[in-house]
Amino acid sequence: MSFSHREIESKWQKYWEENKTFKTEEDETREKFYALDMFPYPSGAGLHVGHPEGYTATDILSRMKRMQGYNVLHPMGWDAFGLPAEQYAIDTGNSPAEFTEKNINTFRRQIKSLGFSYDWDREVNTTDPDYYKWTQWIFIQLYNKGLAYIDEVAVNWCPALGTVLANEEVIDGKSERGGHPVERRPMKQWMLKITEYADRLLEDLEELDWPESIKDMQRNWIGRSEGAEVTFSVDGHDDTITVFTTRPDTLFGATYMVLAPEHKLVDAITTSEQKQAVESYKKEVATKSDLERTELAKEKTGVFTGAYAINPVNGEKVPIWIADYVLVSYGTGAIMAVPAHDERDYEFAKTFDLPIKEVVSGGVIEQEAYTGDGPHVNSEFLNGLSKEEAIEKMIQWLEAEKKGTKKVTYRLRDWLFSRQRYWGEPIPVIHWEDGTMSTVPEDELPLELPKMSEIKPSGTGESPLANATDWLEVVDPVTGKKGRRETNTMPQWAGSCWYYLRYIDPDNERMIADPEKLKKWLPVDIYIGGAEHAVLHLLYARFWHKVLYDLGVVPTKEPFQKLYNQGMILGENNEKMSKSKGNVVNPDDIIDSHGADTLRLYEMFMGPLDASIAWSTTGLDGARRFLDRVWRLLVDENTEEKSSKIVNGEGSPELKRAYHQTVKKVTEDFEELRFNVGISQLMVYVNEAYKQEELPLDQAEGFVKLLSPVAPHLAEELWSKLGHEGTIAYEPWPTYDEAFLVEDEVEIVVQHNGKVRAKVVVAKDATKEQMEEAALANERVKESIDGKTVRKVIVVPGKLVNIVAN
């Protein structure tokens, strides 16, 4: 006999919605728990089975915490700006707003059908003007603090698409979408000064309960390095070139210098003989993205400028080259090359036959670069010193001679914040005809996106908003001065930088959120989502949070106390699910055939939450069979009422022990996100219960409570079958008694001359004499020692009896 999942699930979803079961009230008497999911981008494809994995995990925690008496905040919303909606709109002539709304409705329906306990009154949508009013407000605060500025930077410009592309959108010098040529060109862009927060973003990672791998990715992305800036003069010119190096101790081994092709001095120092070669190389490099240029495996290319620099430490002339592996955006856009002790420089020197000079002993320079430590050689006042000593001494020398200085640099660049697109938050800035600019007055926010029938890129490097003349042109009501609005929009990251704050007070029209509520709910207690957001989203959100902390808006230094990344659900063939492979599993189909509770249980039981595991229909069927067994255990198949097996009583000692062990184990495993192990223990209890004639009512009730976070619809139905009114959602979580966890009896091993002959059960606190007596009374032991003389009996309490007899 199995239960009707369609009937039960729609009944309880309706009940939760009508009764607002999961609405979060402000209640000062209870401890808070804030469980957050990474909100989804509502794509046209709808939800896939990967989404519910993380959502089910946070839902189990939220439901358990409610039953443990916590005041739980568990919200959901939509990260709805972005390129796909805009591209769809351009391709079909429809509005991105309508497309987005339709997708959100699909996502909401699908998510509700999975029975997650969200407070839907707190739903946010990044494309709602009442929401992005505050995204714009934060931008204005960044601008006022000097953290938002306009700069001319080299970007990936695609003439055919008429827009700038992110590095990730460029493959082999062509646009990922459509395969059009892409060129590097300098353009004015909005930048956010995240570099100003680099040290704090690095240091505060120590305080977070995050996976070490994610912390490391952020550390590497920020890329703090200590070293020195060294100034080289250019032979025959007044110009100097500054380089940053983490190894100033190897300065005596610098035999050439490399500039980024875009470095501002290249044209000035290139000799007439080398001009043509330099120009054509610069053209060739202009089509490559930073990622392609710095790939370690690629062949080294470069051109000599004809100019020489003077090595400040020994006065030697070193040739100045240009090469694409040096980026103008990184460090100073120039490097001193020490081929004997750097792999890239070594390859370059070998390719172009440049001198290689050993200054740290320990390697075989004829074969490869030596990057290890060792006594310095060929280095005058550094000879014999180790790396650390030599770095220290060289920095002292450079500073004394005014040829360099100690310096810390970061790999982290300022955040390129503007997009030449329509479907994003308008940047609230006005450019005036006299060359000044100002932000839109805060009382005029939100600055809404104008409705446009034609949203093709303008092709001029501006967004389609440049064509919305009525919206674009403004006049200062006080001075009569004319101005133009900023036409760039914000990137998709903007709205997701602070959404967790808006959930706390989503209808507040006066501020982001009430400070008292922020104080109560922050930081987020658990944040679950995919590892693909390890760097960008999490770093950007931490940056904005720190700015808001400095402004006194938020009370904590960090937004997310604990972070957890769920694994990926792969197709049955162990490949990533994708439409092109035809291996995508649609949750709607599973909910229809097996039920939402089965899907939730299966995704939590597949394996560890952070592992990537292949989908298995057999596993799904197994999950459903378990829920059917639970139903049959508690419900009489003829009457559809509570099973006659359920009685008011104590139950057997074995079952009592299994029950208390289950409560303890499930509680601990769920707390630690080991859902697969906790579910295994629920199965152990069900197996034990099936062996018994009777099942005590209090155990049946406790078991249903333990099951309820994983399979909430079925648990609600069983709770009502056990004679209760209303919902199980706020019933107290079961507790266990240590006294019943202890087993009264133990199994001991009996040996004859060290060989196992039998196992016997004795009382846990049996004396040595009682253990010996039980061992000698065993039939198999009697046979074994028959006719022999017992010389000695060795007893290890609670473990073993060894009879020495011959």
Swiss-Prot record:
The organism's place on the tree of life at top rank: Bacteria
One Gene Ontology CC term in the entry: cytosol
InterPro entries: aa-tRNA-synth_I_CS, Leu-tRNA-ligase, Leu_tRNA-synth_edit, M/V/L/I-tRNA-synth_anticd-bd, Methionyl/Leucyl_tRNA_Synth, Rossmann-like_a/b/a_fold, tRNAsynth_Ia_anticodon-bd, Val/Leu/Ile-tRNA-synth_edit
Binding positions (ATP): K579
Enzyme class, UniProt record, top EC level: ligase
Catalytic activity: tRNA(Leu) + L-leucine + ATP = L-leucyl-tRNA(Leu) + AMP + diphosphate
GO biological process, one term: leucyl-tRNA aminoacylation
Keyword Protease: no
Name of the molecule in the record: Leucine--tRNA ligase
